[in-house]
Amino acid sequence: MKTAWTISLAGSATLAGATLTSSLPAAATTITSAVTPTPALFQHERVQLTEGVLERFSAVLQNDTVANMFAFPRNSTVSKSDVLHRCKVMPGDTAWPLDTTWDVFDDLLGGSLMKTVPLASSCYSDRPEYDATKCASITTDWLSSELHMADPASIMLPLYEGRSCLPSPYNYTSSCEQGAYPVYAVNVTTVAQIQLAINFARNQNLRLVVKNTGHDFNGKASGKGALSIWTHYLKEKEYLPAFKAANGYHGPAIKFGSGVQVWEAYEFAKSIGHSVVGGEAVTVGLGGGYTAGGGHSPLSSMYGMAADQVLVMQVVLADSRFITASSTENADVFWMLRGGGGSTIGVVTSLTVKALPQLETTTVTFNFTVNDTPGPDAFWAAVGLYLDNFERFVDAGTYGYYYIGASSAEIGTTYAGDTDYYFHMESFLAPNMSVAQTEALLDPWFNSLNALNVSYIPWYNHADNFHDAWVVSFPEEYVGTDVVKTASRLLPRSVFKNDDLRNQTWAAYQDAVDQGLFIAGFHISGTGIAVEPPTDTSVLPAWRDALTHVIVGSQWNFTSPWSVIEDSSLFVTKWMDVLRDIAPDSGAYMSEADLIEPNLQEAFYGVNYLRLYALKQKYDPTGLFFALTAVGAEDWEVQTTDPLPYSWNNNGRLCPKSS
């Protein structure tokens, strides 16, 4: 964004732009300290906003009204009196900052403020961004996660943004609007920029969102009228071969900037002879909502959740204080940000995680359809035999990512039923196992499939390290569409030890597919076989005894109207009652769950919620950070105009529930 106003050397400010003699310097200073924190701060973390910097800015500006827009709160913890609990300001409101104020903000940021437009706006001739060549390129790449992660405002799954601006092949209308895409984004490369953004949003009562890569299933990085903090380029990495953590861990560790993505983390770990716990999707950001929400991984059955690996975090809180959080320093923040979800009390700038052994790893991929079996009964018997092996597979430290459905599965269409069932094992991943060991583990199930006359051809891949096995087995995922609504449930070990509950689960799988739904599931445990999980995280307790994470989804056409989306959305939410009844004391993984999950605080957070909510009130009492399913979300509502029977959608004004 270009600087549009300046101040005179004499110090007289003119927001109207009449005096154009010199621009404001970036509001930041590089911190040096006699005491070096452990681990040492990254360069981007040493560039900070301080009271001294703001005092110098105020002295030059000689305009207290403008200077106070960027000030720290009066106390070390934000008070509700600083910003009244009221609806967030929107563009067009009289309280919305003037363009010249945004220009001041951009100057203080050092030029990193971006006025955003929807990614697909180049496809619409009535938009100033119209560019047919650019549109063609965007349309071609629209389903690629790399396209959306590289844009400051776009998200991977646009349904909960409001379907505001999609390329014509995917748009149900012929229009493009800003919708719930943020109106401004700060492309942060320093802590100071995050602090400025937080101060400005808090003091001006702006809606604030945080985007790392935009992977969240429920669109946490979107918000109508919002200012976004974009952490994508916080990419620093450091290997710590003999790190001593406050919790007693002594061993190799890696410090990652919060913008480092899974593929970058895996590559770096491999280069130094290690592995790390991260997501299966290539482009997920390691230090964003993934780890904050717990973070399941292809290595979870071996080592536990991503949150379990974190030894230290650096965080900018809602009062813009930059802190270190560990098991002994700001321990309540450390607890909350490892499992309590993203968009709650602050912005993580880096995290230090355990560096794990570089394990040999085998992966297996295979498929079978009903046409590869004697018939539907044999197909579903084969699926049931997989369920029977969940416990054995998880106890061996393996992970399986599978799909079950029918090729015509779509609510409201003619359904071909049992003529097109399919089972697809995207990847059966066996860490610390050779091909022969993996074959031996799979033999009992495969022998049973052979006895059923099920045809399948397993493809084995082996590498002497996790990264090389993972990279060929987990392709970039299908994103960018608004045609899917999902719900999920974690099913515990007790379900599969009980014949009646196991049979109910097997019948539920078949019923889901016969109802036109699809299943995307994982055999997985949140308690790794190699280590005991830490006791000081806020990870949903249901993860610790889970044997499978089951996602069930409905789908519709790109051109479907809101009425079809409403019916399909409510249908899958209601259908999930089947699994909720089978495992009533379990829960759901918040990052891959139903936005309108009943009793979502219990489902996503379990017994941790009361403490999480109390910490939310302690560290963010004004509700600066908000997301639809985040801690404290029940105090707010998004007043949408979309024709849905619920207000949980990011495309609307954010207001307290009482307003």
Residue ranges and their predicted role:
Residues 1-26:
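Fungal secretory targeting signals
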Residues 19-659:
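Soluble FAD-dependent oxygen oxidases
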